[in-house]
């Protein structure tokens, strides 16, 4: 059980919510603020004075006054008309994060929503009845309207859900959770729809996957150093301290620890090779830059996870209703775009190491890592697959945040595209996962070919894991299943856990 304290979520909590079957409860200390916000909205609605989002239309229709007897219909219509998403359902882990983030935002008491509505969301979460939310349809301002409308429609008994993973109607989902359809009061529909929770949830979910890939890439890169008989001198702490970037310093320390005591390395310390290619030698510089970007993105997304991104905002102490733009997801878009750069670069560097290993001139290994080359092609086309994926990532890494299209009759004339920025991270991560799987296979093959010497004690379990699933490549065979089984292990963090390094979300 995780207790959600609105405004004080942590990255480890968010990772657990995404990855583990934890349940949620709201910190009772938040109840007074929630109730005060709901009362403030009810008082404003009762007075009848125009207040955006409470008794007016929305967007370009904000100047249209809505009579008191139509306020409930206004909120219902808002939810139903905005539920226009398309595409595949959002991943279960992302939906769990979305619900937790929405509860945190609403729980700070500036949205004017009743506790009854929040209790319904928590009940659905804990019953494993998750809204079916189409992943496409948000431009990231005014908030993630379409995705959050699909979330909200379930509370009305409209739309679809997943009941413990099985697709069903919203009404069936409510029944399983012991709930009845809700009637939303003034502003509640808008409070549910307005916010950056979809884009932030997608960005966080994919960030956790990219963090796992980063750690895997440290391991794969270190194994490739041994496979290529590379030097450990470029990882000397003194080099990296002189530059001063913390990510670079931390990455170099990881490579030193992973390669410590390697018999392969010790066997060629007195060779006449002067310098390794950049894909080996500059790993701390490149991976360090990726690490710095990822840490910054994590900081931004944690702030956003704890934010109130509704509009308008209710200030119960003064009775004021202030319209602003906290729904604009530009910080999320920038963070996601930075994560895309890092994830793509992790894959790009791994692809270069694969290319190095299969090149006999650079690695000193048999061409394409196979004996009897010619009749056997070995890793030749596995590298082509890695190159295709790395190239695709370069296109996917183009920033989404540089684009904007006006919506709502030019009332909403600049948008963030944060949801697309966050969503495409999943494709980049999947591509990078498969590139790393190919590198791990190639590096393991190279290490085998260095016999009788072995890799380091830290990397020996990696070799055992790989060889427990895929035998040494002797002759050409149907190769795709080998890549698939190692990619599955990458996704399960089998190699990431070997890295002597952890992110803030794992602590």
From Swiss-Prot:
Cross-link 5-imidazolinone (Ala-Gly), where in sequence: 141-143
Residues that bear 2,3-didehydroalanine (Ser): 142
Keyword Thylakoid recorded: no
GO biological process terms on file: L-histidine catabolic process to glutamate and formamide; L-histidine catabolic process to glutamate and formate
A GO MF term: histidine ammonia-lyase activity
Modifications made to the protein after synthesis: Contains an active site 4-methylidene-imidazol-5-one (MIO), which is formed autocatalytically by cyclization and dehydration of residues Ala-Ser-Gly.
InterPro entries found in the cross-reference section: Aromatic_Lyase, Fumarase/histidase_N, HutH, L-Aspartase-like, Phe/His_NH3-lyase_AS
Keyword Cytoplasm: yes
Pfam families assigned to the protein according to its UniProt record, in alphabetical order: Lyase_aromatic (PF00221)
Entry keyword set: Cytoplasm, Histidine metabolism, Lyase
Catalysed reactions, semicolon-separated: L-histidine = trans-urocanate + NH4(+)
Compartment(s): Cytoplasm
Annotated PROSITE patterns: PAL_HISTIDASE
Gene3D superfamilies attached to this UniProt entry: Fumarase/aspartase (Central domain), Fumarase/aspartase (N-terminal domain)
Source organism, top-level taxon: Bacteria
A cellular-component GO term for this protein: cytoplasm
Pathway assigned in UniProt: Amino-acid degradation; L-histidine degradation into L-glutamate; N-formimidoyl-L-glutamate from L-histidine: step 1/3
Record EC number: 4.3.1.3
Family from the record: Belongs to the PAL/histidase family.
Protein known as: Histidine ammonia-lyase
Organism: Burkholderia cenocepacia (strain HI2424)
Taxonomic placement: Bacteria, Pseudomonadati, Pseudomonadota, Betaproteobacteria, Burkholderiales
């Amino acid at each position: 059980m995780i207790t959600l304290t609105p405004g004080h979520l942590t990255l480890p909590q968010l990772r657990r919510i995404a990855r583990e079957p934890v349940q949620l409860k709201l910190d009772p200390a938040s109840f007074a603020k929630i109730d005060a916000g709901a009362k403030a909205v009810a008082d404003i609605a009762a007075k009848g004075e125009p207040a955006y989002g409470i008794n007016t239309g929305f967007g370009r229709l904000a100047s249209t006054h809505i009579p008191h007897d139509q306020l409930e219909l206004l909120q219902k219509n808002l939810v139903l008309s905005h539920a226009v998403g398309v595409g595949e359902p959002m991943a279960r882990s992302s939906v769990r994060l979305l619900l937790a983030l929405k509860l945190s935002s609403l729980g700070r008491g500036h949205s004017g929503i009743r506790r009854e509505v929040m209790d319904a969301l928590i009940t659905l979460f804990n019953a494993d009845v998750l809204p079916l939310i189409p992943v496409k349809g948000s431009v990231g301002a005014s908030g993630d309207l379409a995705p959050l409308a699909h979330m909200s429609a379930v509370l009305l008994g409209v739309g679809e859900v997943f009941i413990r993973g099985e697709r069903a109607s919203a009404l069936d989902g409510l029944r399983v959770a012991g709930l009845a359809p809700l009637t939303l009061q003034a502003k509640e529909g808008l409070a549910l729809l307005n916010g950056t929770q979809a884009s932030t949830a997608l960005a966080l979910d994919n960030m956790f996957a990219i963090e796992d890939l980063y750690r895997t890439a440290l391991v794969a890169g270190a194994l490739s150093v041994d496979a290529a008989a590379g030097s450990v001198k470029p990882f000397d702490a003194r080099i990296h301290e002189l530059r001063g970037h913390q990510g670079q310093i931390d990455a170099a320390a990881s490579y030193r620890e992973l390669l410590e005591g390697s018999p392969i390395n010790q066997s060629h310390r007195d060779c006449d090779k002067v310098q390794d290619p950049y894909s080996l030698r500059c790993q701390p510089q490149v991976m360090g830059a990726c690490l710095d970007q990822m840490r910054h993105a994590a900081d931004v997304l944690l702030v956003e996870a704890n934010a109130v991104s509704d509009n308008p905002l209710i200030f119960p102490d003064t009775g004021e209703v202030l319209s602003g733009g906290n729904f604009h997801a530009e910080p999320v878009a920038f963070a996601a775009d930075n994560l895309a750069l890092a994830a793509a670069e992790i894959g790009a560097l791994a692809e270069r190491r694969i290319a190095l290993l299969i090149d006999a001139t650079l690695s000193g290994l048999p061409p394409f890592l196979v004996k009897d080359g010619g009749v056997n092609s070995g890793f030749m086309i596995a590298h082509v697959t890695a190159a295709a994926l790395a190239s695709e990532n370069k296109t996917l890494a183009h920033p989404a945040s540089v684009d904007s299209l006006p919506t709502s009759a030019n009332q909403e004339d600049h948008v963030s595209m944060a949801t697309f920025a966050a969503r495409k991270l999943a494709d980049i991560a999947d591509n990078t996962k498969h590139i790393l799987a190919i590198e791990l296979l190639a590096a393991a093959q190279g290490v085998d070919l260095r016999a009788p010497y072995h890799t380091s004690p830290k990397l020996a379990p990696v070799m055992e894991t790989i060889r427990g699933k895929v035998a040494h490549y002797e002759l050409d065979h149907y190769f795709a299943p080998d890549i698939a089984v190692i990619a599955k292990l990458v996704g399960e963090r089998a190699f990431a856990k070997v890295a002597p390094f952890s992110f803030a979300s794992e602590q």
